[in-house]
């Protein structure tokens, strides 16, 4: 009999060839986010951060897009490609940022700040994007805010850490922040990060702007996942302490095999909090089943879709 390790490899190979075969048969492409499991990243036709994935979704020629990521990302693809079938293998894979900013509560919040331009991070539901003037990602939040006249007040949602970081860089005093945070980026420990830096004196600290201000303040580089990846290639450092979701380490190692990447520890060592639990729900099994059944599919009310499309397209125009 096959050993259990060998039978796992055999099962995995079977699954991979089934996914490839289903992709061909259904005319589907797979878009995946950097925070998904390494084996999911391996079956993707395109891998990126949320800005790159939004842009790529529009270019896809296939009639079916399977989105390996969390729910709001698949919604964004559907908003931009209404005539395509957008499949989401795990519709219950949500996001603490999106969940913490509910459409009705946001409507009330906006009503308290009339005359403010609404800038929403893409980590929100399509209903929030429909109430938004312009979306942003962590790649272009600074650019988006800078595109708005300095005297024009801004309502920024839902990530208070990203909002505060942009506020600091622009020196704006007229930004109101929704009080939301990412459960992964909120959990990193400053104490442990500084201790790790002492153990690795030559290492550079690279952090995501969703982290708390006391983390970004000590980082050598702060940027989106795509920006961090590029920076690690440009930098002369050979070691990096990575203060973002640990899924990115697979791509870092793949791109820069000679460099060393150390995941930053969360406050609570037992929780595995530097992994996005939702992203890791997307497995090869769920992808295969989703392709097979061409379901679950993302469905969005047309009026909501059109309103959301305006704010997303404005973001993409800004770049």
What does each model-identified segment do?
Residues 227, 236-237, 244-250, 256-319:
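C-terminal functional extensions of proteins
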Residues 47-96:
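Active-site cofactor/substrate anionic-group-binding motifs, chiefly glycine-
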Residues 99-108, 127, 133-149, 156-162, ...:
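Active-site glycine-rich loop that binds ribose-phosphate moieties when present
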Residues 11-28, 314-317:
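N-terminal basic/disordered segments at the start of proteins
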Residues 45-53, 83-93, 134-139, 173-182, ...:
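Short hydrophobic/aromatic-enriched beta-strand-loop microsegments
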Residues 87-114, 177-186, 264-280:
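Long, charge-dense
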Residues 1-6, 10:
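Single conserved hydrophobic/aromatic residue that forms the stacking wall/gate
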Residues 27-36, 40-42:
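N-terminal glycine-rich anion-binding loops that anchor highly charged ligand groups
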């Amino acid at each position: 009999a096959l050993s259990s390790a060998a039978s796992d490899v055999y099962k995995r190979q079977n699954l991979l060839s089934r996914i490839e075969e289903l992709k061909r048969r259904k005319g589907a492409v797979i878009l995946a986010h950097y925070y998904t499991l390494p084996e999911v990243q391996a079956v993707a036709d395109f891998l990126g951060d949320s800005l790159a994935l939004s842009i790529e979704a529009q270019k896809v020629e296939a009639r079916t897009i399977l989105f390996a990521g969390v729910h709001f990302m698949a919604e964004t693809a559907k908003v931009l490609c209404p005539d395509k079938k957008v499949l989401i293998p795990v519709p219950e894979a949500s996001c603490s940022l999106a969940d913490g900013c509910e459409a009705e509560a946001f409507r009330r919040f906006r009503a308290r700040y009339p005359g403010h331009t609404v800038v929403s991070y893409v980590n929100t539901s399509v209903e929030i994007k429909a109430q938004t003037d312009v979306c942003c990602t962590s790649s272009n939040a600074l650019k988006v805010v800078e595109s708005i006249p300095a005297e024009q007040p801004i309502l920024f949602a839902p990530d208070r850490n990203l909002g505060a970081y942009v506020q600091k860089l622009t020196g704006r005093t007229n930004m109101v922040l929704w009080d939301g945070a990412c459960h992964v980026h909120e959990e990193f420990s400053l104490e442990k990060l500084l201790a790790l830096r002492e153990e690795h004196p030559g290492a550079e600290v690279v952090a995501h702007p969703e982290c708390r201000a006391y983390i970004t303040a000590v980082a050598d580089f702060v940027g989106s996942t795509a920006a961090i990846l590029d920076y690690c290639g440009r930098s002369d450092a050979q070691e990096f302490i990575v203060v973002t979701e640990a899924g990115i380490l697979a791509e870092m190692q793949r791109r820069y095999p000679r460099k060393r990447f150390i995941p930053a520890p969360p406050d609570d060592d037992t929780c595995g909090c530097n992994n996005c639990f939702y992203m890791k729900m997307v497995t090869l099994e769920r992808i295969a089943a989703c392709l097979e059944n061409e379901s679950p599919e993302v469905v969005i009310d047309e009026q909501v879709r059109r309103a959301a499309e305006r704010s997303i397209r404005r973001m993409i125009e800004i770049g």
